[in-house]
Amino acid sequence: RIMTFSNIRVKGLGSLHKPVIAIGPYIHYAECMLNSEEMNSLKKELGKTLLFFPTHTCCEGGLEYEIHCMIDELLELKEKLGFDTVIVNMYYLDENKNGFGDLYNKAGFKVTTAGHQLDINFLNRLKTIILLSDYTCSNSIGTHTGYCVYLGKPHLVINPVQTLEEVNPLWRDLWETFEKDSSQAQVDKRLLASKYWGFDCIKSREEMRALLI
């Protein structure tokens, strides 16, 4: 039995000839690692916060990007929208690659990671990091995109690592929409994220228990 986000992904996995079930965004089932008092205290300390997810560069299928251009873009967005803090959530293997983590730190950003994706607390950490933010952005579309939208955080693709022509046609509508920042785009982003991450496929605790046991 395979679990995935959405019905559109269920169709894509049909060739595996195994039962495939859509359960919505996995982040729904994660727990924030801070209680409300701790969360409020940290949010007060951070102020208005921009959260950036740089594309992975160390894993299979990773994409390289020009970090100095990325830092300039983030500083411009920080100034434009009046953020007090910029948090960069890096893939755990990328933090020390080419000194990227140090460069982000020198720019005045806070660098963090949710850790290895197979760590039992990976999603709990990721959910906590996202909930601390007021606005999120990335230079690519990834799992984080749908998670941010699901958790009610605006998301924008800036300085993208691929052109629309380079993007897989299956995901081109996501890239094209998330590069826009209009009021209508926010509505379209929610609709697309729901389609690909299965916001309407969430299971109850009892339903999940029945699937897992």
Roles of regions detected by a PLM:
Residues 23-33:
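Short beta-strand->alpha-helix junction loop in the catalytic core
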Residues 31-100:
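Conserved catalytic-core segment of nucleotide-activated headgroup transferases in glycan assembly
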Residues 1, 48, 131-134:
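Conserved acidic residues
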Residues 165-213:
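Leloir-type glycosyltransferase catalytic cores
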Residues 3-6, 53-55, 89-93, 114-116, ...:
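Short His-Asn-centered micro-motif
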Residues 1-23:
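Active-site-proximal region of nucleotide-activated glycan assembly enzymes
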Residues 95-151, 155:
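Donor nucleotide-activated moiety binding/catalytic core segment of transferases
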Residues 17-18, 82-83, 152-154:
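A short helix->loop->beta-strand "cap" motif at the edges of active sites that frequently abuts
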